Amino acid sequence: SNEQNPTVTYSTAGKYKVTLVASNDMNTSTAEQEGYITVLPGKDIVLFYPFEGDSKDMGPNAIHPEILKLGDNMDVNFNAPARKEGFTCAEFRSKDNQNYAFLSLPDNDALDFQATPVTTSFWVKTSNKTAANLGVFQHGAGPNASTDGKNKQTWFRFQKSSPFIRYVIEYSGLSGNWTDYKTKAMTDGEWHHYVCVHTNGSTYLYIDGVKAAEALNKGLKPIDRKPYFIGAMYR
């Protein structure tokens, strides 16, 4: 496009390389800049947090979280260096199970997943080898917070001993899906991509594009719509 403020429509979600060329009226000075644009699917996406300088949800539901802090000098830094130069990520500062910061999402109808298929995808880098449980997300009520006293929650955490990762659909004690990764600790200080899938009573964990663990045919489990937390150190 040669327009001053062009509007470009993409028919398919994905990542596209774009080139911006700018010049003055006399064409005596020209600047060219290459970059990438990410186009999200407009259907079925619930949350999208790029964490590029802030905690805003860039998805269609605009579910913006608040920072909750336990202890002194705990916070979430949204200007930490990301895995690619020039980009930022969220750094969750923590010390122990009494001193950490995390994000809390406001209640929203879009978070009422119940037993519908859900995929959660994220990048994490950690070198913390001492925390007993290092949480990434937790959604739904535990037994002490639910009116019926039942677990109706899902969560993902790193552990310092085997199983090194647990992705769980927890319902009525241990009757849910406990998807355990036991191969090796992932607290190696490198970026890794994780995908958690819950569908038709089965759960799957993918690490860097490879299926690493699964828990099959456990039956459909409802998940409470609140609370929803991202990042925490506990226990």
Question: Which residues are covered by each model-predicted region?
Answer:
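Short, solvent-exposed loop/turn segments at the edges of extracellular beta-sandwich modules
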Residues: S23-T28
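Short, aromatic/His-centered strand-loop micro-motif at the edge of beta-sheets
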Residues: Y167-H193
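Flexible glycan-contacting loops in extracellular carbohydrate-active proteins
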Residues: A215-R235
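Extracellular glycan-recognition modules
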Residues: G42-V46, S55-G59, D96-V168, D188, ...
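Low-complexity, glycine/proline/serine-rich flexible segments
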Residues: L68-T116
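Surface-exposed, flexible coil segments in extracellular/virion-facing regions
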Residues: S1-T9
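Localized edge beta-strand/strand-to-loop motifs within extracellular or lumenal beta-rich domains
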Residues: E190-Y204
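Short, tryptophan-glycine- and acidic/Ser/Thr-enriched carbohydrate-recognition patches
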Residues: P50-F78
